[in-house]
């Protein structure tokens, strides 16, 4: 169990799930450092967290863009300088686009695959090395239920998340003995800016409730967490469906 207050870095902290997770961590007294692309949005988020924090801590910020890998090392260095050795690194940042858009725009498809898999993994590798160097810590990364099976509506997005989930499972097997705890978050549909305009399916969740479940998984050192909880049951059965059935389903 992580000793409170923890030194926490959140990448993607200005919107949606990242903001919800950062808020909950600040409210319980953790020292939080925010990473994101937009400095003005980071400043606003930091001010919001400061007002919610139960501890006497400043909320630091640094620019970190998953489309620009050259920003990764500097951002983590700034976070560690401000906080000291890191206990928890949370990665929520990602890109989403519909399958139709991705098929029509190969440039967009390339960016999404690069950001969601290759660049996220490179950021995680840098974070992983820092956590292990200080004796261990928690790397919590948002993947998706879309990566569980190949599906018609999310072929490319799902592939990016399938790769990320596989990477996180491999880290768990390779470095658990070294003190690295990996938490792979597999959200279903969550109402955030990323899903704005999309039809709301059954079992949809809200960001704050999902954040609560994620923090519980971090504290319990769970390697995989589905959120909302109903998705664990849904995906259990989806994984069992034979391929000829999956071909007929339009989801």
Regions from the PLM with identified roles:
Residues 14-15:
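Conserved glycine-rich cofactor-binding loop
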Residues 28-45:
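Conserved glycine-rich Rossmann-like NAD(P)H-binding loop of the short-chain dehydrogenase/reductase
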Residues 52-70:
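Rossmann-fold cofactor-recognition segment
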Residues 73, 94-110, 153:
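Conserved mid-core segment of classical short-chain dehydrogenase/reductases
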Residues 124, 160:
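Active-site helix of classical SDR
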Residues 144:
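Residue(s) in the substrate-gating loop at a strand-loop-helix junction
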Residues 184, 199-236:
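C-terminal helical subdomain
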């Amino acid at each position: 169990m992580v000793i409170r207050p923890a030194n926490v870095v959140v990448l993607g902290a200005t919107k949606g799930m990242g903001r919800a997770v950062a808020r909950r961590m600040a409210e319980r007294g953790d020292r939080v450092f925010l990473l994101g692309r937009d400095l003005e949005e980071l400043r606003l988020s930091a001010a919001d967290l400061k007002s919610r924090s139960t501890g006497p801590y400043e909320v630091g910020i640094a620019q970190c863009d998953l489309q620009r890998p050259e920003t990764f090392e500097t951002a983590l260095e700034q976070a560690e300088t401000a906080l000291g050795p890191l206990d928890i690194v949370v990665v929520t940042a990602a890109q989403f686009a519909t399958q139709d858009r991705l098929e029509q725009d190969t440039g967009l498809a390339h960016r999404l695959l690069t950001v969601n898999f290759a660049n996220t993994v490179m950021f995680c590798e840098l974070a992983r090395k820092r956590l292990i160097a200080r004796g261990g810590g928690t790397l919590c990364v948002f993947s998706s239920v879309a990566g569980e099976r190949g599906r018609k509506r999310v072929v490319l997005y799902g592939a990016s998340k399938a790769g990320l989930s596989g990477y996180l499972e491999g880290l768990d097997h390779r470095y658990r003995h070294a003190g690295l705890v990996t938490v792979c978050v597999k959200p279903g549909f969550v109402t955030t800016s990323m899903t704005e305009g999309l039809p709301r399916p059954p079992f949809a969740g809200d960001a704050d409730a999902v954040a609560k479940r994620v923090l519980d998984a971090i504290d319990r050192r769970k390697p995989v967490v589905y959120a909302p909880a109903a998705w664990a049951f849904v995906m259990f059965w989806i994984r069992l469906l034979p391929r000829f059935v999956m071909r007929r389903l339009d989801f």
